[in-house]
């Protein structure tokens, strides 16, 4: 049996490259960028922000109503309620704060721009203009095609976004606990 090639992390530099290869005036591209930047800054696994083939269940998966963007003049960030994840087997949920970074990779700016196109109708947060929900296969396929179009070779997968975010924090010499600073326990009042 052949060993699977190692998954390549989607680093900050690759995120910038992805950003430069998307036409953000296109609503579907704006949606992909919002999903990628949300996942990267939130250290999200693909199952925490996409819809599975079995369909969307708002009691388990992230609905648009659990994504709160502070749209005031001085936006502080976005609050997500992740209801279930691999690291939350009892589905207690966790509140996750994504800060405004005021840079090209800012998850708040990308979500605000995308939500302008999407509107606030019920359902999963990340929808293509034809109403199809973003899935793991979409994330992996688009990630691979965007990076291939940019001339980047590698075994990229949706998990590479999570790995890349963690690698970037580690490589930036943040204290070990910094990658956990954006997580707010379920009991924390907001």
Can you say where each PLM-predicted feature lies in the sequence?
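Extended, non-catalytic subsegments within catalytic or DNA/protein-binding/adaptor domains
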Residues: 1-190
